[in-house]
């Protein structure tokens, strides 16, 4: 192997196969651009982004890791969200969840 060399299998890589998705219309009501990263809990995004927050609960943008979507002031666009995976625990962001997304009875 040569330093920096990448050995890549032929074909396409499908992201987030089998995960629940949702489509939501989002509008930036603020006076500044807002950028949302690929793994940000969409429910907790900037309050100037107007959309049905219930749809964004437990979801993130369905985009490639490490990328982001920018919402310009006054812009409205439709985005696809995908369910967070793993343990489905959310900490940080804007502190609105701070624990398990799926609350179980008796816990």
Curated annotation (Swiss-Prot):
Pfam families noted in UniProt: Urease_beta (PF00699)
InterPro entries: Urease_beta-like (IPR002019), Urease_betasu_sf (IPR036461), Urease_subunit (IPR050069)
One GO MF term: urease activity
Domain of life: Bacteria
Biological processes annotated in GO: urea catabolic process
EC identifiers of the protein: 3.5.1.5
Pathway in which the depicted protein is active: Nitrogen metabolism; urea degradation; CO(2) and NH(3) from urea (urease route): step 1/1
Subcellular location: Cytoplasm
Gene3D superfamilies: Urease, beta subunit
Catalytic activity: urea + 2 H2O + H(+) = hydrogencarbonate + 2 NH4(+)
Record key words, sorted: Cytoplasm, Hydrolase
Record's GO cellular component terms: urease complex
First-tier enzyme category under EC: hydrolase
Family that this chain belongs to: Belongs to the urease beta subunit family.
Subunit text: Heterotrimer of UreA (gamma), UreB (beta) and UreC (alpha) subunits. Three heterotrimers associate to form the active enzyme.
Name of the featured protein: Urease subunit beta
Organism: Janthinobacterium sp. (strain Marseille)
Encoding gene (name): ureB
């Amino acid at each position: 192997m040569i330093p920096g060399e990448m050995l890549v299998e032929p074909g396409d890589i499908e992201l987030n196969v089998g995960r629940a998705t949702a489509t939501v219309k989002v509008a930036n009501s603020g006076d500044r651009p807002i950028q949302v990263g690929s793994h940000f809990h969409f429910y907790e995004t900037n309050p100037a982004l107007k959309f049905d927050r219930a749809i964004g609960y437990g979801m993130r943008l369905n985009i490639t890791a490490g990328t982001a979507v920018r919402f310009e002031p006054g812009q409205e666009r439709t985005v696809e969200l995908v369910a967070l995976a793993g343990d489905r625990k959310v900490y940080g962001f804007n502190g609105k969840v701070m624990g398990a997304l799926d609350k179980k009875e008796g816990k």
